């Protein structure tokens, strides 16, 4: 496998109006990790999801859907102790039933080191960092990924995670604590606004390049930037999702040890609008 994602999977019941005003919902597979793995698999990559579902019809249905989309579900856990989480969405409203559910109950003792040794990258986001056993599982997973030499990639997605946190301030403080644990950051303007009070990356670069951080991708409205500690590149924004950029990194054979010596032309390849860029391998640094 090439990419491991840790997070939640929930049954998302979506409506065109506010949940309390609708009688019909469309059932979808929700959760950041599930969505990222599906995107990565659609590109032709191998993506495995580390998550826990309830041993109930909802959990089995979600697992079957993910497997049908090409996601490696061999690492999914199922429990009789907690139900599969459910989230109602509609009209810019998110009503989540996550407390005391299977996803947040996944603890560090349930993780094994072996899957990380076969992975090129470990990816996580902010929704699952809420105070719970799952947050501790993230710390364990980061340590296992680093020991295995896998890239640690953090996609904060704070605006998307905020509805699932009891307090926005706690979300931002927790995100700040996890930023420097990653090798690669995928940031949006809303992340910077919530963390640093500004949408301009130049005001935060010094603070961001600390700890393990060696590479930052910054998504603006119409442009994407890539920074190492020494070089920068940019490209017009089109379809270069984080999943696509990471897929290109995997295809090019970029590992953690390579990040400090990436050159501008490599960053340009990662950000390219040319779909054929995914076929490039072994680019010189």
Describe the role of every protein-language-model region.
Residues 1-71, 267-285:
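Glycine-rich phosphate/adenosyl-contacting loop at the front of the ribokinase-like
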Residues 46-126, 278-285:
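Conserved N-terminal subdomain of the carbohydrate kinase-like
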Residues 128, 158-160, 191:
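Active-site-proximal loop/turn and secondary-structure-junction residues that shape catalytic pockets
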Residues 162-230:
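Conserved phosphate/ATP/ADP-binding segment of small-molecule kinases
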Residues 211-215, 228-285:
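Conserved post-catalytic alpha-helical subdomain immediately downstream of the catalytic base
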Residues 21-30, 205, 230-237:
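Short pre-catalytic strand/loop immediately N-terminal to key active-site residues, enriched for Gly-Thr
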Residues 137-148, 173-181:
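Catalytic-core regions built around general acid/base machinery
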Residues 47, 73, 152-154, 186:
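Hydrophobic beta-strand scaffold residues
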